[in-house]
């Protein structure tokens, strides 16, 4: 069976006051107005200062780019009508979570009641990319293998160096905040989809979860859609960055699928090993070293990303995403979102200017 590597892209935006630059709990007025235009493609999140958008099922990155561009434009325009702005980054540089309101909804009340401060403080913004797989059995085997590459793409996406008025020293502090949740991070290897389903059934049977959406791993075979969902990235400032990461995930899936058709596969490394690289990516972004487990040695992250681009090169043109993949080279040249935020802060000396930079970058390429 030929697999169609369809795409779905979800982004979470911060809502900010243009005067104070603080996060603003807006009682979902932006969401209600946006749903009249985009229906369920715009949703509320647990904190009122967050707006989530999502594309439909897209055939390629070109279609996904168009939809994300339109969604950013619409949400920005409607925020402006409320006297507010939107921004795309993994964390807000200085607002405190204690001041933000929780959206009134039974699901969010249940999560807050269960997870307490871990949930209330989870004021973060991510990018989720879905890649279509019509076979769940195939999806679990591809997910096992593609886990190795998650830190590489994550390093490129790092966009949350600041938290509550502090330079955290991390390029992505968002992931450190989310680590407080259960069932997060890099998942284990599952030998089959039955193996995975039995794990989910056990958690439900033992009242750990009521459905598989409460498994918040960095990658998961989605419980309701025919997709592998990649959840590791910070929300990117630029649409170009979002599409680059989307293309990387799509190409990795297509490449591993192609190898499988040739009776070959990439090694499925343990969670413990991949976690080591994830921590390095969170701390240093693309400026550190990751471990090449095959060679058992440290390698400059930028060099490993170039190796990744070589690895997927034979499927890029088949998928029609060459321009999006080429943008990875610009990120290596210009720095990640975190690098650029840090540069703005170093130059200006204040976080308000960083917020202005984030909100302006968010709208580049956004159009009706």
Protein language model regions, located:
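C-terminal accessory/tail domains of diverse enzymes
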Residues: 1-82, 111, 178-368
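Short, glycine/charge-rich beta-strand/loop segments that flank catalytic centers
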Residues: 83-100, 164-168
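An acidic- and aromatic-residue-enriched active-site/binding cleft used to recognize and process polar
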Residues: 18, 84, 89-94, 127, ...
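Short, low-order "capping/linker" segments at domain edges
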Residues: 97-109, 169-184, 277-278
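Internal, well-ordered domain-core segments that constitute the primary functional module
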Residues: 120-146
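Acidic, His- and aromatic-enriched active-site or binding-groove loops in soluble protein domains
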Residues: 105-126
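An exposed, glycine/acidic-rich loop-and-rim segment of catalytic or binding clefts
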Residues: 135, 143-190
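Acidic/histidine-enriched active-site and ligand-binding environments that engage anionic O-linkages
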Residues: 76-90, 154-159
